[in-house]
C-alpha cells in the first residue's frame, strides 16, 4: 500500500488514481476531515482515505500502523503564510519530513518520494534545467527555499541509514482540480470558459514547462513503481517550454472569440528567457513520455469546467 500525503489535493488526487491504474493500493492522507461521501468510491478497495497530517506524528502513525505501507509519496505542503509567520511554515515542513522518515523506518518502507519544485532552479542561468545543476543560494520565495532545504536535510538524515529518498522537482502543473488561478494556464482557461477578464498581467513571451496534471501524476506513479532508480532527484514535467501566447492560441482553437488579453514581451522581473526541465533521467528510468499536448489537455480541462466543476 502506498501512502500519499496530500492525497486529496490537486496533484495528490491525480497521483492516487495513477497509482491505482498501475495496480497499487493507496492510502490517501488528508489533514482535513474525510469528506462524505468519500472520494475515490469508484476505485473500491484500491484506495483508503484517512485523516492524517504529515506534521502530526501520532496521526500519521495511526494511519499507517498495521496497514503494510510499502511506499511513501509526500505531496502535502503547508501554506507559507505571511512573512511574519514563516517560522511555523518551516517548522511544519521539517516536522513532516522527520515524521515520514520515522514512519518509513517503522514500516520498513524502502523508498520515500518528496515533492520539490522547479522553483529551486531560480537563478540557474542555463536551460533546460538539469538535476545536477548547481543551485544558487538566493533570497528566493519561501516555497522553493523550503523545498531546497528539505532536499538537503533529507540527504543528511538518511546519509548512512534509512530509506532511499527521491526528490521530485515538479514543473508548473495545470488541469482539472487546480484551485489556484495564479498559474498561467488556469488563469487563461477560466477567463475563456467563464468569459471573465484575465487576472493580473500575463506576459505573452514567458515560456515555461507547463505539464498537464495527468502526465505529472503518471510520471510520479511510474517512479514509485520502478524496481530500480539510478538517481536521488528527478525532474517531473513535459520537458519543453510553452508560452502564454501559445496557450492563448490553443484556447482560441477550442473557444473561438474568447477575449484573452496578454501583455506583450517578457516580465521585466522574470529570468528573461524560457525555463523548462530536462526530463532525460525520468524517461530513461521509467519510459515516461508526456501523453498530453496543449490542445488535448485544454480540451479535457475545458470539458471539466463546463461539466459544472468550479476548478
Each model region followed by its residue ranges:
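Catalytic helix-loop patch of NAD(P)-dependent Rossmann-fold dehydrogenases
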Residues: 87, 91, 95-99, 106, ...
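N-terminal Rossmann-fold cofactor-binding loop
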Residues: 29-34, 54
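C-terminal substrate-binding subdomain of Rossmann-fold SDR/epimerase-dehydratase oxidoreductases
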Residues: 196, 200-311
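Active-site segment of SDR-like NAD(P)-dependent oxidoreductases
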Residues: 78-80, 118-127, 171-174
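N-terminal Rossmann NAD(P)H-binding glycine-rich loop of SDR-like oxidoreductase domains
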Residues: 2-22
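NAD(P)H-binding glycine-rich loop region in Rossmannoid oxidoreductase-like domains
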Residues: 51-92
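SDR active-site strand-loop-helix element
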Residues: 5, 29, 72-76, 112-118, ...
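NAD(P)-dependent short-chain dehydrogenase/reductase
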Residues: 127, 152-208, 213-215, 221, ...
